[in-house]
Structures are given as structure tokens and as C-alpha cells.
Amino acid sequence: MTDIRKMKGKERLVKEYDQLTNDPDINNCFGIDYWDPDADNPDITHWQITLIPPVGTDYEGGFYKIEAKFLEDYPISAPQMKFVTRIYHCNIAENTGHICLNSIKDDWKPSLIMEDVLNHIMILLYKQNPSSPLNDNAAELYRKENKTEFLAKVKEYSKKYANINDYENLKKQDIHLLANCKCIWCQIIFRYKGSF
């Protein structure tokens, strides 16, 4: 890969990061930051994404961390993404956090941007696909007509692994903003929730 192509990929990442972090319609349900293992050397190719699903969803009350890594040939190759926070979901591997999502696998196109990917992840939280599971146990419970047992497991994981009160660095006003998000994504999903 040429240095020019690598530079273009990083320029695009910076542009996407700036757009995502400055757009109030997005920034209310996702907090996005560079991964910063070394405070002196932040890395634009490694993002930490915070997701707080809106009130009224199965994952309400959870505080989820997602990791995104971008290879040198991004956007030719898809971002490598996984949930860092354990989550009980048909399409998310319980122990590794890997996500079964076509838009970051077989259907990836360089024309997709991170806003699209985050939108797809948000929709995946509302509309699971038990016919393509990474968590067979979750898929089995999800397929049952009465989802009480599945929802109890979701809440158990949310309380145990995604408890918002465990994150001291999150300000109370941020919690209120995120948990009551009125962004276009959340509004679209609420409007069409019954038709998914």
C-alpha cells in the first residue's frame, strides 16, 4: 500500500471522527473517542465508542463500550469492531464481543462511513437476527414465542456488566442526555419499532 493511500485513509478517519463528535444528532447516543492507551500518543486508528441505548429498548439502562480498529487500508477494508462490554445478544459473541453484522463483513463497501456502521449497530440492538447467531443460547431463547427468559437474561447482563453507575467519569448530565436521546436515529427506531 502506498503512503499516499495510507494518508488518505487517516485523513478520512479524522474527518469522520470530527463529523461524528460534532453532530448533535449522533453524539447524544454515542460517545466517541480515540483509544488512548498512552496519553502522549493518541491513535486515530483505534476508537472507543460508548453506547447508551434509549429508554424503552431491551438494552435500556446499559452502558456499552465498543472498540473499533481501522487497518492501514481503511476504507478498502472494514473496521474491525467488537463490544468490549459483555452483552447478551443473538448476534454478538458472548466471550469475545465480535459482532455478526453484514455491513462490517461481507457487505462492506468503501463508500460506507462510520455513521452508517453505528446506525447498523443501533438497529441490531432493536432487531436481532436469530438465524445468524454468534450466541446460540441467546438465539434459542430469542426464538421462543414468550421472550420473558431472554429479556431476563438481557437485564441480568446489563446489570452485571453494563451498569452505568460503574462509570465514575460519566457526568450526570451526560447520562441524562444519552438515556433520553431524541436524536434522529432513536426517533426513527421508536417510530418503526413495531414494524421491524
Placement of each model-derived feature along the sequence:
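UBC/E2-like fold recognition across ubiquitin and ubiquitin-like conjugation systems
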Residues: M1-F63, E67-F196
